[in-house]
């Protein structure tokens, strides 16, 4: 199974997280417009990535005839629901520059949790899930 598109989206997601971290370190209030823009762009990539996984990747793996990959796929899909929901709530809540300026420390606290979880998930997929798929 060719998963190059998924891997490319992981690079985009990880780069987006890195950019948000850099902007946050430079000052949330001072870079609120850029942070809101980057967060919206990241949300778009993540939303698209999740939709493609749900419509194509997970169903393909679950019907692949490979029990190990089918179980792994179901587990990853289930695990991602909580991470995805938290990220979507975060992006909706903090995708506005005025709100970012008003509550920079609240943004930082939420971002440290949500973005850390998304980052960890991408790294885990890159390390465990995608190599297993490519070995098919």
Residue ranges and their predicted role:
Residues 1-136:
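Small-residue-biased structural context
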């Amino acid at each position: 199974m060719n998963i190059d598109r998924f891997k490319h989206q992981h690079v985009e997601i990880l780069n987006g997280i890195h950019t948000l971290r850099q902007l946050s370190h430079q000052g949330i209030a001072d870079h609120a417009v850029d942070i809101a823009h980057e967060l919206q762009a990241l949300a778009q990539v993540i939303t698209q990535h999740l939709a493609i996984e749900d419509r194509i990747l997970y169903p393909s793996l679950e019907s692949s005839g490979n029990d190990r990959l089918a179980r792994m796929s179901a587990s990853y899909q289930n695990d991602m629901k909580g991470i995805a929901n938290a990220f979507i709530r975060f992006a909706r809540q903090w995708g506005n520059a005025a709100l970012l300026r008003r509550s920079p420390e609240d943004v930082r606290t939420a971002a440290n949790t949500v973005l850390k979880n998304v980052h960890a998930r991408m790294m885990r997929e890159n390390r465990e899930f995608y190599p297993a798929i490519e070995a098919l």
